[in-house]
Amino acid sequence: MHSVRRLASVFADAVRIYYDDGGCPLCGRETSGGHICTGCETALDAARLPENAFVLRRQHESGDIRNAGKEPEPLDCFSFYAYESDAVRKLLFYLKKYPDRRTAKELAARLCEILPDSRKADRTLYVNIPRSAAGMRKYGFDQAALLASTAARLLDRSGTWAKGGTKAAVPAVYFADLLAVRPFGKVQKALTARERAANKSGRLYVRPFFRHLPWVPRHIVITDDVITTGSSVLAAAETLRGYFPNAEISALSLAVVTRFRFDEPLEDLLN
């Protein structure tokens, strides 16, 4: 009964957001078309990162037998905002709670701006970090999947390429909900950086339907709403490399935590 009530609530929220013409998603002020208001936009602009690209790498723990002698591959990442801003936190909270496609389209367009051209076409696959089971039960949707699918749809409108010279068009940019998470893990929010990495290690897997992709991807963009310690995107990249060894993999997020209190400062990981 609780799940039915929750589903009805999510559906009602989606209908309200879709047909509501006014209201900034962050502060509730009336705006034309329900876009982000000028004041909140100014606050978000102040939180925009001066450098959107960085490399994420994590060294293995000493004594880790599973990865002995194996150097972890670095991951190219692209983020738009710094998480520490109050406006960014409000925006992320809103995205976690409401499946607002209008706001997601606006934000996905910004994410597309910071991506290099190689990640925008030519058999590029967008993959989301799967939301936790608790989050899916509570809100009924995956905010990272919404961002990733919207970005892929925006980029694919720029053109398609014809397969074998026939009239049948194949999308150059494609979204697939490929990744799933195994159960019985700990809640990430309460863990340190090392604990997060251990919690995610081996828990992500690729769903069987990946064989039905329109092509073998040349580029894979792992999309999430926020990168905190980087354990999720690194675990996703490691899993995807096992299935697509020749693909160029990178990560894309709306925000990144530039300072976080855990075992190792995040600045040591973002270098």
Tell me what each language-model feature is.
Residues M1-N271:
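Glycine-rich phosphate/pyrophosphate-handling loop used in enzymes and phosphotransfer proteins
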